[in-house]
UniProtKB/Swiss-Prot annotation:
Belongs to the KdsB family. GO terms for cellular component: cytosol. It is found in: Cytoplasm. Its main location: cytoplasm. It comes from Shewanella baltica (strain OS195). This is 8-amino-3,8-dideoxy-manno-octulosonate cytidylyltransferase. The keyword Transferase applies.
Amino acid sequence: MNVTLLIPARYGSSRFPGKPLAPINGKPMIQHVYERASLAKGLTNIYVATDDDRIKAAVEGFGGKVVMTSPDAASGTDRINDAINQLGLKDDDLVINLQGDQPLIDPTSIEQVISLFERHPGEFEMATLGFEIVNKAELDDPMHVKMVFDNNNYALYFSRSRIPFGRDTQDYPVYKHLGVYAYTRKFVQAFAALPLGRLEDLEKLEQLRALEYGHKIKIAISAFDSIEVDTPEDIRKCEQRLAVD
């Protein structure tokens, strides 16, 4: 099975401009993401998908591969769709979408989503990762997206609010979403062509579009948390984690 991992990266960010190039222990964040991903087994190719020449230069500077995408991409999925069209992938090729703000992603977590497609061919069109929340401060933080899933590990909903809500107890597991997606090239193209979903627009979560239009999302639960970098403070958290790893 041909497996291409794409890391969408854009320079502009309202909260953290230039985030992909922010240094973490002397290396740009995008390099940490790329090098972590390269340790995952089963990948055919890895590319950074960007529209920014500064990011392109940084990636090529450490020996990584880049595909330049349109600056008009309205979303991460549109950027991924643009990239796979340029790369000429086949309909049944597997695409891994690893968010470029995951510098501490564990390579085995990437292998988990690949394994879902290998073990359950044809049963679903999209897969992603979850992690049981340990840090209680994340429970009500809208930057940490929560998720619920059924007994077969198919997603029921994703939200910036705490879900599920325990009416009579607070002692129950809550899972957060980690920024890794897997799908076939054919599904990416179909997904990108769908109109914006009502719930997607409310929560500002693209994965809800898939659920709103009746597509199944399989969930793998990772044993490893991953810090999502949204602010300069998150960079410091990453450096602290790396110091003890």
